[in-house]
Amino acid sequence: MHIQVVTFKLDGIDDAAYQLHAEQNAPVFAAMPGLRAKIWLANRQAGTYGGIYTWDDAAAMRAYQSGKIFQGLQANPHMIDVTVRDFPVLAGPTKVTRGGY
């Protein structure tokens, strides 16, 4: 399992417009190969949004990163200061805490 954390700020759109965008695009992520789950994030006070992605493995994450959807996120003028971090999962303790294994 592999975790990816993506954050960004909104520019030129408000929270309601982003929420509509997220709801319209959620089915696209639900059908994405290798994606176990995406948790959508919104810290409205800080103006920071993003997602936590749980991937089957690093290869599935890399396929997403080289694809059209991720490239569109990075090119979207309404999503600025994009940060992307990824982490391999420690399987042993994650199993103990019911982390999806």
Regions from the language model: what does each represent?
Residues 71-76:
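A common structural junction motif
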Residues 1-49, 56-66, 77-101:
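Short S/T/G/P-rich N-terminal loop/turn motif that feeds into the first structured element of a domain
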